[in-house]
Amino acid sequence: MIPISSDVFPFQVLAVARYLQEQPYVKASQITAVGWSLGGGAVLAALGQLTAAENSPLRAVVAYYPYCRDLQPWQAKVPALSLMGAQDEVAPPEVCQRVFEQLPPGTALQARVYPEARHGFDVSDLPPYAKFGSEIVGYNAAAEVAAAREVQQFMSRKTD
């Protein structure tokens, strides 16, 4: 098996978006990348691979409890929504917030932190409190509903 580094994930996100743009059954102006955890970090990191002036293949990005340890500030003008749990031990929101504070003024980012939510807050198969390695993860119905509402509102503003 060939090991795959998470460094390639942002490039994969953009490659898939560019591929989808070429498909006749896809409305190319409406492609949104959505990721959870490491995938959430990947969709945000994909923005770092775009220049401010570049015509992005992405209409928007949504990141659920993104893993931001290696995330760098970006210049791209693509709207982004980040949904995080204040109690997240796997992907602490403070790590993302430090990056978000370095974004250029006018960056189209909405960051929401749900006070009682943990990593996996929208995974209804999880109990509210479960061990994941040395960290605690868990479902939070209130955060799941609030995040779903937030995504719906965010996406309704991003459609033609």
Question: Which functions belong to the PLM regions below?
Answer:
Residues 2-24:
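Alpha/beta-hydrolase active-site loop
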Residues 25-37:
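Alpha/beta-hydrolase fold nucleophile elbow
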Residues 40-53:
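Short glycine-enriched nucleophile-adjacent loop
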Residues 53-67:
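A conserved short beta-strand
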Residues 82-84:
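Short beta-strand/loop motif that positions the catalytic acidic residue
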Residues 87-91, 119-120:
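Acidic catalytic loop of the alpha/beta-hydrolase fold
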Residues 92-102:
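Short alpha-helix in the alpha/beta-hydrolase fold that links the catalytic acid
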Residues 108-160:
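C-terminal catalytic histidine-bearing segment of alpha/beta-hydrolase fold enzymes
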